């Protein structure tokens, strides 16, 4: 249902209008906020940063890990992730082609060596899984899973209920602005935005995203949407649809190499997220912090994404603060009617949902 609404919004150019009306300073801020957000995700995935009841979050405690007997299951993976960040950073600094991919492979290989030598001891109970490919099912290990149990298994029994409407609208809101935020961030990093902040040929990208959402639902998968990891492809020079098509072909081939890809651990992919975050944050240099009515909303957008753990919340904070700050400082000419409407919608969401 959400995907169908997306298609309608894309065909009627509503999504494009929302994208175009967001000020360029906020588009730059979205790129920075996404960078901090995915870097935080990477640090959490690697357990370099962990939850803490006293301070909310904290760095991993190696001493506690050693004394608690978890160093060889969790502590060593944190060490490997830190090494992976260094390796990936060096690769990028030396302008090595495919540096992020080589960083993942190098960290994975180090993990395999640690498991083989006994330095890393897998324990699924604490989320420490084996990093060795599992071929126990023989040739069946290389065959894609049977989609028939979930393919076209749609349930329309609750369509007329209020709860269903609330869920659809909630998903629509989050996915709508997450996708726009990702497009803003990646396009900004790729220097594809025009001087007025608009993006050429955005309608095709939005339609592809909408159709992907519908196709994913029919296949029974989680939402197929635009991912911020696309920035890693942009950093390697990807700019056209050929990049996306090539990626799709490789994804298809990966279905038949599942044992290898499923063995790649979180501590090997986390450094990639951290470094992609760095690439995204570089857009902060393009924000004019001397222009406070533009800079303050950009700042609110940036800090909201990692702290609220949501791209859409960052956009919400940015737009609402932009409307308020510019209206109350006499810069109403910068605020279009659509921005006022969006600000009201965001505020209503916080009150009603």
Pin down the residues of each PLM region.
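Helix-loop-helix hairpins and the membrane-proximal interhelical loops
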Residues: 60-66, 104, 108-203, 344-348
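Membrane-helix interface "capping/anchor" motifs
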Residues: 90-101, 235-241, 282-293, 308-312, ...
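Loop-to-transmembrane alpha-helix initiation sites
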Residues: 25, 29, 74-80, 99-101, ...
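Helix-boundary and loop/linker segments of multi-pass membrane transporters
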Residues: 71-75, 153-163, 198-199, 288-292, ...
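Inter-helical loop and helix-membrane interface segments of multi-pass membrane transporters/permeases
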Residues: 17-27, 36-90, 117-156
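Helix-loop-helix junctions within the multi-pass membrane cores of secondary transporters/permeases
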Residues: 1-34, 185-284
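Hydrophobic alpha-helical transmembrane segments of multi-pass membrane proteins
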Residues: 5, 22, 26, 71-75, ...
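Hydrophobic core segments of alpha-helical transmembrane domains in multi-pass membrane transport
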Residues: 2-10, 32-47, 78-93, 103-116, ...
